[in-house]
């Protein structure tokens, strides 16, 4: 009753073994609260999906608020409640729940809140326990055949907009005024642009970089002195290059060895093998291989050297 105000349109849903006198008393109390400008409609919860109520008709929808509540609201019923509510309308749902999920027909209060959110409702309140008389509690236990039942009340609101509604966006394509940058102080800029010319006064002594070099530093070194000292052991010892020689001694010693001639590049008998299969002989061992550069060494496997027959 706290969510009902004068002038509201209220839908009261009932279900289970509720007496007609109790329904009439509840409707009378609601009608008194909404006043002459408001109205109250009554519908059985099982026939809600078959009713012909228009969308966004009611300010408040109350379901299961008549004790003892035995209705377990399905997802379709909650979605229909959300459809019937006006934007920012309120739904009040009372339902029997259990403390732990046992896989039966009753669910926990947390799952009831989740179902309201899945139906499209927002601002779901915390579950509040509804006090029942001993007689109402016995009737509820007899109807559901479940122990440890706890009736809770949860309220939720419909968003302040309709599903599929649109709103015009105010976009401005006018050019924005350029903000003038503050002018820099000339004295501040000079501080960060000091040079040697600015400091050329009597208080500062500047050194000439050429005066830091001696005559020995300016002499051109002898190329012989630049060679590495590796392999120098006098006339009695044989010169030997290092393992990873980088000074050129290894190449020099290799060229000084007598009887060693430079390896000649490999050549073919006909001189056309490197051009490709179109220029090769019928018995050329390079058949089937791609063209290669003249003089390039090509290694053939044992299978290629043997004939097919």
Swiss-Prot record:
Keyword terms, alphabetized: 2Fe-2S, 4Fe-4S, Cytoplasm, Iron, Iron-sulfur, Metal-binding, Mitochondrion
Gene3D superfamilies associated with the record: Vaccinia Virus protein VP39
Positions with a binding annotation for [4Fe-4S] cluster: 270, 273, 281, 284
Pfam families linked to this entry: Anamorsin_N (PF20922), CIAPIN1 (PF05093)
Binding site for [2Fe-2S] cluster: 230, 242, 245, 247
Record-level GO cellular component terms: cytoplasm; mitochondrial intermembrane space
Region called Fe-S binding site A, residue ranges: 230-247
GO terms under biological process: iron-sulfur cluster assembly
Region (Fe-S binding site B): 270-284
Position of sequence motif Cx2C motif 2: 281-284
GO molecular function, one term: electron transfer activity
Cofactor section: [2Fe-2S] cluster; [4Fe-4S] cluster
Region ranges (N-terminal SAM-like domain): 4-169
Motif mapping: Cx2C motif 1: 270-273
InterPro entries: Anamorsin (IPR007785), Anamorsin_N_metazoan (IPR049011), CIAPIN1 (IPR046408), SAM-dependent_MTases_sf (IPR029063)
Region feature Linker, mapped onto this chain: 170-218
Top-level taxon of origin: Eukaryota
Domain remark text: The C-terminal domain binds 2 Fe-S clusters but is otherwise mostly in an intrinsically disordered conformation. The N-terminal domain has structural similarity with S-adenosyl-L-methionine-dependent methyltransferases, but does not bind S-adenosyl-L-methionine. It is required for correct assembly of the 2 Fe-S clusters.
Function description: Component of the cytosolic iron-sulfur (Fe-S) protein assembly (CIA) machinery. Required for the maturation of extramitochondrial Fe-S proteins. Part of an electron transfer chain functioning in an early step of cytosolic Fe-S biogenesis, facilitating the de novo assembly of a [4Fe-4S] cluster on the cytosolic Fe-S scaffold complex. Electrons are transferred from NADPH via a FAD- and FMN-containing diflavin oxidoreductase.
Assembly description: Monomer.
Sequence similarity: Belongs to the anamorsin family.
Protein name, entry field: Anamorsin homolog
């Amino acid at each position: 009753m706290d969510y009902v105000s004068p002038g509201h349109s209220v839908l009261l849903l009932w279900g289970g073994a509720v007496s007609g006198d109790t329904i009439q008393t509840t409707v009378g109390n609601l009608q008194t609260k909404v006043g002459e400008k408001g109205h109250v409609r009554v519908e059985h919860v099982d026939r809600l999906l078959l009713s012909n109520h228009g969308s966004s008709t009611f300010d408040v929808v109350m379901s299961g608020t008549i004790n003892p509540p035995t209705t377990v609201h399905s997802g379709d019923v909650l979605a229909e409640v959300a459809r019937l509510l006006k934007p920012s309308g309120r739904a009040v749902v009372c339902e029997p729940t259990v403390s732990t999920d046992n896989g039966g027909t009753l669910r926990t209060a947390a799952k009831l809140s989740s179902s309201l959110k899945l139906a499209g409702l927002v601002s779901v309140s915390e579950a509040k326990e509804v006090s029942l008389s001993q007689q109402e509690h016995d009737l509820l236990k007899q109807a559901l055949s479940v122990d440890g039942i706890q009736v809770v009340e949860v309220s939720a609101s419909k968003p302040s907009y309709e599903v599929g509604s649109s709103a015009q966006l105010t976009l401005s394509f006018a050019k924005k005024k350029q903000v003038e940058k503050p002018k820099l102080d000339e004295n501040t800029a000079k501080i960060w642009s000091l040079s040697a010319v600015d400091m050329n006064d009597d208080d500062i002594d500047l050194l000439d970089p050429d005066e830091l070099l001696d005559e020995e530093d300016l002499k051109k070194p002898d190329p012989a002195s630049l060679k590495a000292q590796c392999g120098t052991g006098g006339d009695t010892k044989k010169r030997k290059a290092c393992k990873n020689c980088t000074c050129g001694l290894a190449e020099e010693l290799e060229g000084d060895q007598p009887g060693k001639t430079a390896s000649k590049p490999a050549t073919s008998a006909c001189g056309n093998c490197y051009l490709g299969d179109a220029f090769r002989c019928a018995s050329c061992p390079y058949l089937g291989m791609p063209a290669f550069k003249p003089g390039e060494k090509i290694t053939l496997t044992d299978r290629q050297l043997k004939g097919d027959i």
